[in-house]
Regions:
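Conserved class I S-adenosyl-L-methionine
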Residues: 63-73
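Short amphipathic alpha-helical/adjacent loop interface patches that line ligand
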Residues: 23, 49-52, 100
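S-adenosylmethionine
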Residues: 87-155
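N-terminal auxiliary segments of SAM/dcSAM-dependent transferases
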Residues: 1-38, 42
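Conserved SAM-binding loop of SAM-dependent methyltransferases across substrates and taxa
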Residues: 74-87
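Conserved alpha-helix/loop element of class I SAM-dependent methyltransferases that forms part
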Residues: 28, 32, 45-63
Length: 155
């Protein structure tokens, strides 16, 4: 957790507790359902959580903003971003049901109230969002083709 605090020192106590809980939760779930490379679980905070939060160094999402995390897998980048931005609404989507289950269980375990989940392919998402985030899902050109219809037209 120290690496998160190094880059985001102004976290509330609740956010600190939520980030701290992630390691044990993901280690437990990863032993049942492979959502993070077993060789990489020791680097959870540096390779997954901090990487997910990188966007927060260049943009501050306004309260009420809606963001879709496309191809969330076990909840990256959506869950770390939902912790960091508790007043922003996140919708996490993945085509693999067991990964959506892990993300849902992790979010529930740490008390996140600003996330919803959907087991679906990206092309099936009908709602629109202010932003779409994604991490290691597909080539960017392919991703752009899929998400064009999900971005609010005033963005």
């Amino acid at each position: 957790v120290e690496i998160i605090l190094k880059y985001f020192p102004d976290l509330t106590e609740e956010q600190r507790k939520q980030f701290a809980a992630l390691y044990d939760l993901y280690t437990d779930w990863n032993s049942k359902i492979n959502v993070i490379s077993r060789k990489d679980i020791e680097n959870l905070y540096e390779h997954h959580v901090l990487h997910s939060l990188g966007i927060a160094k260049v943009i501050q999402f306004r309260p009420g903003t809606s963001i879709m995390d496309l191809g969330t897998g076990g909840g990256f980048p959506g869950i770390p971003l939902a912790i960091l931005f508790p007043e922003v609404k996140f919708h996490l989507v993945d085509s693999i049901g067991k990964k959506v289950r892990v993300a849902t269980e992790v979010a529930n375990a740490i008390g996140l109230k600003n996330v919803t989940f959907r087991h679906a392919r990206a092309e099936e998402e009908k709602r629109t969002f202010d932003f779409v985030v994604s991490r290691a899902v597909m080539p960017l050109a392919d991703l752009i083709k899929i998400i064009k219809k999900t971005i609010c037209s005033d963005r």
